[in-house]
Amino acid sequence: MGTIEKRSFSFRLRRSFGDGGSTNSRNSNNNSSTCTNHNNQKRCSTPLTPTSTSTGRLEVPGAASVSRRSSIYKKPDKNDGGQIHLIPDVELPLMTFADQYNIEKTLAEGCFAKILLCRHRPTNTLVVLKAVHAELTTIKEFQKEFHYNYELSHHHHILSAYAVAFQTMDYYVFAMEHAPYGDLASNIGPNGLHENACKLISEQLSSALGFMHSKNLVHRDLKIENILVFTPDFTRVKLCDFGATTKKGLLVHKVKHTWTSCVPPEQLELIKNERFQCLPVSDSWQFGILLYNILTGNPPWQSADWVKDQSYANFMKYEQRKTTKVPDNFRRFSPRLMRCFRKYLSHDPEDRCKITEVAKYMKDRWVECRISTSKSATLISPTNHDQDSCIYLNQREGRLSGDENKLRFKRMMSTYGLDIPIDQAMVRRRVWDWLSTCDANFDPDVESLHALDLLQ
C-alpha cells in the first residue's frame, strides 16, 4: 500500500460557562499531516497531543478522531442516514488518567464500565469520563458506542460526547458532559413523579428516540438509569448509553445485564444465543415501561411472560380485549392513557405504535386517582385540577399510631368536604341515656368511660 495524503482534523469543543452544560463544535483546523494506511490501520505521522488555548476552547486531549471529510466517510445516503452508519477504525492513543485529569469521584460503576467525574487540568473543565473495561469489550464495540454518541450529540435531548477518546492499560475511555442531577432513577420517589413531570420527560425522550429512528438506529436499552437530569424540574433531560445501539434491520443478540421488565416479550421467548432482527418497536415497548415506571415508581411487572407473571397476563388479556376489566395496577390511569399503554405495550410487535405517538396524548389527563395496594384503602378522586391526582391512602400503613391515623383521616375528609362537625356534648348525653337503659348487671361507670375514650 502506498501513502495517502490526507488532512488531519483536530476536533474542538466550545465550553459554554454559566448554563451547566456545553456544546460541541465540529469545526476543524486546517493543519495537515501525512497519514499512512497499512492493512486498514490509520496512523498519523504527527501525534495528537493535548493543547489548550486562551480563547475558551478545549482541544482534543490526546484524542483519536476522524473528520467527517476524511475518505473513510461516504456521501450521505438519504435512505440509511449516510455517514452515521460508517464507524471509523481509529487507533486510540495510550495515556493515563493522571496525564490530564484529576478524578474527583466515581459517579457509577457496573460490570462493564465505570463513570468518573473528572476535571481537565489544562482548561479547568468538568467532564465525565466513561471508562469501559478493555478485557470485557472489543475496540470495535467501544468505537461504535463512541461514534454513535458523538454523531447524535447535536440533538438537544441526547447526551453530548466530546471528541475525546483514548485508552489506558485497563480501559477504553471517552468524555461526555456532566449531568448535575444524576440519572432519573435517583430522582424518582417510591410513588413516582408528578404527571406534569412525566409529560415533560416523555416528550423530550420521544423526540430523542424519534431522531434516532429517523437515522435508522435503535437504542435497545431504554430504562430510567439511562436518562440523565440537567434541571430539577425535569425541563431538560437527556438520553445516554449507546452501547447497545444498533442499525435497524441487523441481526443481534439480546442485551445483557438489563432489567427483565424492560425486555419485550418477543425477546424473552428466544433461546440462548438466538439472534433476532433489530427493530424500533423494541424501543416503543421499553418507552411504555418507562412511562409506567415514572408515574408509579415501579415497573408494571417483573417480566413480560404471560405464563409466569400474573400481572402481565392480566394486562395481556386487557390489551387483547379478552376482558374489559382494567388490571388493578393500571386502575389509577385515565382511559386515554390506557389507550396509549395499549399501543406501546402490545404483545404483538407489529401492532405497536411509533415512539412519537405519545405526542397525541400530551393534552389529556393521564392519572385520575391513585389507589393503595392495601385492600382497606379508600379510593378518592381529586377535584383540584392543578394538583397531581396521585393520592394514596394508607401508604404508610402500620407506621402511624392510632391517633395519627385518626387525625390524618379527618384532614382528608375535611379537604374533600366530607367532614361533618359533631356536637360532643350531645354524644355524651346520648351515651348516658343508652347506658341507663341497659341490663341491671351492666356497670354504667366503667363502660361509659370506655365508650368515651373510643369517641375521643
From Swiss-Prot:
Give the catalytic activity.
L-seryl-[protein] + ATP = O-phospho-L-seryl-[protein] + ADP + H(+); L-threonyl-[protein] + ATP = O-phospho-L-threonyl-[protein] + ADP + H(+)
Source superkingdom: Eukaryota
Q: Gene3D superfamilies per the record? A: Transferase(Phosphotransferase) domain 1
What does UniProt list as catalytic? D221
Q: Which SMART domains match?
A: S_TKc
Q: Which residues carry this modification: Phosphoserine?
A: S334
CC cofactor? Mg(2+)
How is the protein's activity regulated, according to its record? Answer: Activated by Pka-C1-mediated phosphorylation of Ser-334.
**Comp. bias (Low complexity):** 22-55
Keywords, alphabetical: ATP-binding, Kinase, Magnesium, Metal-binding, Nucleotide-binding, Phosphoprotein, Serine/threonine-protein kinase, Transferase
CDD domains assigned: STKc_SBK1
GO BP terms: namely: long-term memory; medium-term memory; positive regulation of gene expression; short-term memory
The record's family statement is: Belongs to the protein kinase superfamily. Ser/Thr protein kinase family.
Q: What else is known?
A: Meng-Po is the Lady of Forgetfulness, a character in Chinese mythology, who ensures that people are ready for reincarnation by providing the 'Tea of Forgetfulness' that makes them loose the memories associated with their former life.
Descriptive protein name: Serine/threonine-protein kinase meng-po
Taxonomy of origin reads:
Eukaryota, Metazoa, Ecdysozoa, Arthropoda, Hexapoda
- What is this protein's gene name? meng
